[in-house]
Design a protein with these regions (language model features):
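C-terminal motif of bacterial Sec signal peptides marking the signal peptidase cleavage site
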Residues: 17-20
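Core hydrophobic alpha-helical transmembrane segments of single-pass membrane proteins
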Residues: 11-15
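N-terminal maturation segment of proteins
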Residues: 22-594
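Bacterial N-terminal signal peptides that target proteins for export
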Residues: 1-9
């Protein structure tokens, strides 16, 4: 996955879109008819100038965003996390929001309205996480991904010596940034937030100490090596001290992680323009969980007749990939790509490849994720990272953490073909630079999760019962995330109750269940996997009904992916005409019941 939404490169929102209104210029007074078009063209041009200014402002306020996008003049720089710096970010975003909101519907053509609403969406999402969520003052996840130096270490965008210089600049900036973060956190903190922070900052300290020096050991610049040595020692101390400070807060930890119903609903609207009532959203999630559990029972009746669902899933999980998860994933990628080509499912717009590697110690909070070069980079590899089990776990838990081959097939589908990697191949070729830069949480994760079920339906892996179980365990994981997010933040659910649901309803091993339940507290938007998937499924159903044909599925996928990454309701308005609205798919029987 692309990371926690509050710190990801993606901004995740969209304003309502009023298109497809079918009103036309009057047929009389033909001589004056071109005037509105001329005015719209002028305002569209002004809007695009404002968009260019917004992008440049984003680079200035969020230099890690810029560097990850491929603007390497920002290499090594970190944001200003001081209270004054956060206020300056918020003030700038509010001013930008006012600027774009001033472009009225009557001043813009359809394309201009879409672009304006997409920009307003990004701004609203940033403002929610920055101001309304309270996360800058409680949640280490607001910061930890921003601090990742992976780009300098793993992305060959420049010679190693140049990347080392950027990394040294980053290391030199790190102690100040960490001091600002520590100053922002208001005690006491929720227990799961503390654990995340301890693991993240402790992971950074370990990585800086044990792994980074060897990466740059061959660079022969003595002065640069001296700077590296000094800044490396300071970075190790700063990250280790931060982990120790957070660990010292554990006796005072709280369980005050819930956003509350009002703020959670605001999050859904501000970040995804989903305005459905929470009870309706919960019912849809429960329906999808029930659908997938029924499908799992049917598959298990063939794969492990007479066994319980848990025993059936355990049998699938026991068939481990040869050589471990990373080697297994590497073997799957070429097969998945060829399957997409053979089945003509979606266009592959380029020859780029993704490689599978073990995740670094500082970023192992989820089993798998992918790092993809930004739109300003050219001809660089993407890396599909897989986290090993926590060495502090029991041997049994460590072994259980590695998925079976069938389940891993759909992790690889999610992360690479045709999930995140393919989606970003399309996004990086979007006709509008803004769409290349800003890809939303529900769009990205919804597409990747949608891709899993779509690939099974197309027959990947022979669509055997074992393969179906692999797909369904991934789907059940996301269903329980969806329900946990709602429960943890609006329904009084405890972390222990969420963990039990992951084990009993999604059949997760103990280690994954612990990770996933904790993640729900500090990543409340992780319902976006299932929510995004169900919005895409409903849009596909509606679009293909209006555009039938033998290649309709591929045409749908290509058009959906062409927009970059707006909130899906906004894409729905573009593809179907009419207003932007959130519509989630439910199985036909369930839909009738609702």
């Amino acid at each position: 996955m692309r990371s926690i939404p509050v710190v990801a490169l993606c901004a995740v929102v969209a304003a309502s879109l009023a298109v497809g209104c079918t009103s036309q210029a009057p047929i009389t007074r033909a001589a004056s008819a071109p005037a509105p078009a001329v005015a719209a063209a002028s305002e569209n041009a002004a809007l695009e100038t404002a968009v260019d200014g917004f992008i440049e402002g984003m680079f200035q306020h969020y230099p890690t965003f810029a560097a990850n996008a491929g603007k390497h003049e920002f290499d090594g720089k970190l944001p200003d996390y001081s209270p004054a710096g956060l206020k300056a970010d918020a003030d700038w975003l509010h001013a930008q929001r006012a600027r774009f909101a001033a472009f009225g519907d009557d001043q813009l053509d359809e394309s201009g309205r879409f672009h304006r609403d997409y920009v307003l969406a990004v701004i609203d999402g940033r403002l929610f996480w920055l101001e309304e969520s309270g996360f800058p003052y409680s949640n280490p996840a607001f910061y930890t991904d921003d601090l990742s130096p992976s780009m300098y270490l793993t992305r060959p965008y420049a010679p190693l010596a140049q990347r080392m210089a950027a990394f040294v600049t980053y290391q030199e900036a790190l102690p100040r940034a960490i001091a600002q973060i520590k100053g922002n956190l208001k005690l006491p903190l929720p227990a799961s937030y503390i654990t995340l922070g301890v693991n993240s900052f402790g992971g950074y300290a370990s990585f800086f100490s044990k792994d980074v020096p060897a990466i740059f050991a061959g660079v022969g610049d003595a002065a640069l090596q001296a700077r590296f040595k000094a800044s490396n020692a300071a970075a190790i101390k700063a990250t280790r001290d931060m982990a120790d400070w957070l660990k010292a807060q554990q006796p005072h930890a709280t369980q005050d992680y819930a956003l509350g119903a009002a703020k959670f609903s605001r999050m859904l609207y501000a970040t995804e323009r989903v305005d459905l009532p929470l009870d309706r959203l919960k019912a849809i999630g429960e329906s999808d969980l029930k659908r997938n559990l029924a499908a799992l029972k049917a598959a298990c009746d063939q794969f492990a007749p007479g066994k319980s669902l848990g025993a059936c899933v355990a049998r699938e999980a026991a068939d481990k990939p040869v050589g471990g998860a990373v080697e297994g994933a590497r073997a799957q990628l070429a097969t998945l790509r060829q399957f997409i080509v053979d089945k003509n499912l979606v266009s592959i717009p380029g020859t780029e490849q993704a490689k599978a590697e073990e995740a670094p110690p500082f970023n192992r909070w989820n089993f798998a994720y992918i790092e993809i070069p930004g739109p300003y980079e050219k001809n660089l590899p993407s890396v599909y990272y897989i986290a090993p089990p926590d060495p502090s776990w029991s041997r049994a838990d460590q072994q259980a953490y590695v998925p079976g081959k069938a389940a891993l097939l759909f992790v690889s589908s999610h992360e690479v073909w045709p999930g995140h990697f393919l989606q970003f191949l399309h996004a990086n070729r979007a006709h509008w630079k803004f769409g290349q830069l800003f890809v939303g949480y529900a769009f990205a994760e919804g597409w990747a999760h949608y891709a899993e079920e779509m690939m099974f339906d197309a027959g990947v892996g022979g669509a055997t019962p074992e393969v179906h179980i692999g797909q369904l365990t991934n789907a059940l994981l996301r269903d329980v995330r969806y329900l946990s997010a709602i429960g943890l933040h609006t329904g009084g659910m405890t972390v222990a109750e969420s963990e039990r649901m992951f084990r009993e309803q999604a059949f997760q091993d103990p280690g994954n269940a612990r990770q996933q339940a904790a993640r729900g507290t500090y990543d409340p938007a992780y319902l976006n996997y299932t929510m995004g998937k169900l919005m895409i499924m409903q849009l596909r159903q509606d679009w293909i009904a209006a555009h039938p044909g033998p290649d309709a599925l591929k045409a749908f996928h290509d058009q959906f992916l062409s927009y970059g990454g707006p909130p899906i309701p906004l894409v729905r308005g573009q593809m179907l005409g009419g207003k932007a609205q959130a519509k989630l798919w439910t199985a036909p029987a369930a839909a009738a019941a609702h």
